[in-house]
């Protein structure tokens, strides 16, 4: 799932692939702002055919958090 998310981040959000690790923080390390986080959620929902529970969104701080959520729910 990390590779799928990594491809999405690189291709759709123009993130440098070298920055993408499970520990990378979306806002601090990848430079996302709140709008880009919302875009990421929408892209993941479309690509992986899931709906993110709004209550979990504030807990998605790292790439690893997103990967774990996708693995549990996709």
Labelled PLM ranges:
Residues 13-31, 48-61:
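Phosphopantetheine carrier-protein modules
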Residues 39:
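Conserved alpha-helix in the HATPase_c
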Residues 36:
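Two-component histidine kinase catalytic core, primarily the HATPase_c
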């Amino acid at each position: 799932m990390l590779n799928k998310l990594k491809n999405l981040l690189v291709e759709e959000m123009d993130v440098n692939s070298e920055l993408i690790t499970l520990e990378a923080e979306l806002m601090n390390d990848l430079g996302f702002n709140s709008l880009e986080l919302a875009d990421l959620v929408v892209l993941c929902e479309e690509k992986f055919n899931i709906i993110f529970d709004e209550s979990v969104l504030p807990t998605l701080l790292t790439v690893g958090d997103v990967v774990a959520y996708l693995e549990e729910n996709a």
